[in-house]
């Protein structure tokens, strides 16, 4: 790139050509059934998409968790963000990859796509698309330097969860990295354990099933990655980082 020239978001060298494979798409029934109030209603979106609300939902850990996830990526990388996120996460990730990088944000809900586009309007390196990441082959193999899945897996049923994980692992190029940040089974002594059990039963119907097995065990592709897992806040949250070998 010549000095003084700004990156062009339409430039195919910035966003990966054909990284998102076209497919038939509809709002999944599980999303309508369990999360219409949170992700498909513009009235609640305006209330939920506030830094203070996001911080409260994560018991004051939102900024810490976002920073820790974003720090796993580097300027100039092509990164896929799986699902839109309330709060400032996408902006932080766009800032991290910088003007010479590219951020593709993907969500199945048109409302969330429109909302994220508004947040990222000032970042020419960012692109937001509508796609269902549980559709096999929806992302081209090896298309990204990095993939980030921030608090998505606990919101999908097990079958869809396994397909999403498999698709995201396939999207990482050799030497690239994938980062999962999500809930984790808290320590027995955790004072919030009873509260979170109630939250999961009443508001997050698929969360408990996430704890039944390690995230990486849900795809055979994980054998091609080196994994590091850390937990924080008494084990309530986890960060799983995989680096693809080869």
List each language-model region with its residue ranges.
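Class I SAM-dependent methyltransferase SAM/SAH-binding core
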Residues: 78-136
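Helix-to-beta-strand junctions that scaffold the AdoMet/dcAdoMet cofactor pocket
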Residues: 98, 156-157, 172-174
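N-terminal, positively charged/glycine-rich alpha-helical extensions of SAM-dependent methyltransferases
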Residues: 1-49
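Conserved alpha-helix/loop element of class I SAM-dependent methyltransferases that forms part
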Residues: 56-76, 88, 92
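A short SAM/SAH-binding and catalytic strip from SAM-dependent methyltransferases
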Residues: 145-159
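A short acidic, Gly/Pro-enriched loop at the edge of an enzyme's catalytic core
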Residues: 134-147
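C-terminal alpha-helical "lid/dimerization" subdomain adjacent to the S-adenosyl-L-methionine
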Residues: 179-223, 227-236
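A short glycine-rich, Lys/Arg-flanked "PGG" loop and its adjoining helix->strand segment in the class I
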Residues: 162-174
